[in-house]
């Protein structure tokens, strides 16, 4: 009898346990059904829109848009080429070229400044002949393969690098004027304003230095991330205001004179903050009293330059610098689609596939940069090709083979186009 009672309670215990498990699973299932996705990643647009819409551009950019351009907007350049005549200047290979965005510097005297894989700086003329070449790095520093950023200050050349050094050289011969070091490596272009220059380091600190001796005038620290993105950061100047973006996507406006905050606009959620190493923002561009930029998280922004208020946000998946011409914004996505947007509303007017005639599908082909000149888009690719596209129709006019791997965004000066590859500068006239 006792055994029967014990068996009864044992069976009852397991029966209750099974019911509870079933109810628990049902409750969990119901809870999952109630979960709402707050941050849902939008898929990049890979479909053409209004491909037959003609885009009319009336104005050409005056002056030299690649010379002392503090707004980063090149516009519609007065230039044209068919790449019939190519020449090159070779240098020691930059091993990390694939993952960095080094830039040419054009000087007031029309010379070209760049560097090689061991940190040697060279000054060449428009015909690609050497004016001078110097290397101010030690043997130990050269093994670090520094990436350099440049700006011109009259007769001097300002240099900052990704191994924490910054210095000033005589632009006539490359002689050292002064040298200094920073707490953290630099990771941005350099902008000059009156007697000072500005750059951003890997700690998301923008620093303002004296041109005379390199002493720090002020700095402004923004929120930092533990893991750093290799994507170059960007700053733009307009009047006495500097605008810059950090690797978390925060856009900040400061007074250049004293570094005081005017406004700061975060553009990413806390989810992105935790994965800042994967966020790649384009360069900032100032035009029409707005700041424009895009990123590889499928977003392009227009921010009011005075208030920091986001005017609009649209779906474009690009970390390439946009170009603003009149009331139109041109951007090219990582998937190779050309976007034309309305400046005021952010509405997408036209989308065309720039890679439709590219046959090489073995490796993922990505755009690396573009310029617009005389109503033509010149688009560089990471497989060494350059595509010429008609702005009016959106159709390809030609595909040129420049190199076997990544080439830079095109640069234009005095009727010549220049491209950078990992071991040479290519010239087309």
Predicted features and spans:
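Extracytoplasmic beta-rich repeat domains
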Residues: 25, 48, 61-63, 88-106, ...
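Structural signature of WD-repeat beta-propellers
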Residues: 116-117, 125, 161-162, 201-202, ...
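WD40 beta-propeller blade core
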Residues: 122, 167, 207, 216, ...
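Short loop/turn segments that connect beta-strands within beta-propeller blades
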Residues: 125-129, 170-174, 210-214, 255-259, ...
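Loop/turn-rich, solvent-exposed surfaces of beta-rich toroidal or solenoidal domains
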Residues: 324-325, 331-340, 347, 351-389
């Amino acid at each position: 009898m006792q055994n029967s009672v014990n068996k009864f309670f044992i069976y009852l215990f397991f029966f209750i346990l099974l019911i509870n498990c079933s109810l628990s699973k049902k409750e969990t299932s119901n809870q999952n059904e109630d979960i709402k996705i707050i941050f849902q990643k939008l898929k990049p647009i890979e479909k053409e829109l209004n491909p037959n819409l003609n885009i009319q551009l009336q104005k050409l950019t005056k002056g030299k848009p690649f010379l002392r351009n503090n707004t980063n907007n090149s516009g519609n350049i007065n230039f044209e080429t068919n790449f019939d005549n190519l020449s090159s200047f070779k240098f020691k290979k930059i091993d990390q070229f694939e993952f960095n965005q080094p830039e040419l510097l054009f000087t007031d005297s029309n010379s070209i400044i760049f560097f090689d894989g061991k940190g040697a700086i060279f000054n060449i003329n428009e015909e690609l002949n050497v004016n001078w070449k110097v290397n101010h790095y030690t043997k130990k520093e050269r093994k670090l393969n520094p990436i350099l950023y440049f700006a011109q200050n009259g007769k001097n050349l300002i240099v900052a690098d990704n191994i924490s050094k910054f210095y000033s050289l005589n632009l006539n011969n490359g002689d050292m004027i002064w040298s200094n070091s920073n707490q953290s490596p630099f990771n941005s272009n350099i902008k000059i304003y009156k007697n000072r220059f500005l750059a951003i380091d890997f700690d998301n600190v923008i620093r303002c230095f004296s041109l005379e001796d390199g002493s720090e005038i002020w700095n402004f620290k923004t929120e930092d991330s533990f893991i750093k993105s290799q994507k170059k950061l960007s700053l733009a100047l307009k009047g006495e205001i500097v605008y810059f973006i950090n690797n978390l996507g925060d856009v900040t406006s400061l007074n250049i004179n004293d570094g005081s905050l005017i406004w700061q606009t975060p553009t990413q959620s806390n989810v992105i903050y935790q994965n800042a190493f994967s966020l790649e923002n384009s360069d900032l561009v100032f035009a029409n009293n707005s700041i424009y930029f895009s990123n590889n998280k499928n977003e392009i922004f227009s921010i009011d330059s005075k208030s920091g208020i986001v005017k609009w946000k649209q779906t474009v998946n690009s970390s390439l610098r946009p170009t603003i011409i009149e009331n139109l914004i041109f951007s090219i996505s990582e998937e190779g689609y050309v976007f034309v947007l309305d400046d005021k509303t952010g509405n997408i007017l036209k989308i065309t596939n720039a890679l439709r005639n590219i046959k090489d599908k073995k490796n993922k082909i990505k755009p690396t940069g573009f310029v617009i000149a005389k109503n033509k888009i010149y688009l560089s690719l990471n497989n060494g090709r350059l595509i010429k596209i008609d702005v009016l129709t959106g159709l390809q006019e030609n595909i040129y083979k420049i190199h076997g791997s990544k080439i830079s965004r095109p640069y234009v000066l005095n009727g010549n186009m220049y491209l950078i590859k990992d071991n040479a500068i290519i010239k087309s006239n």
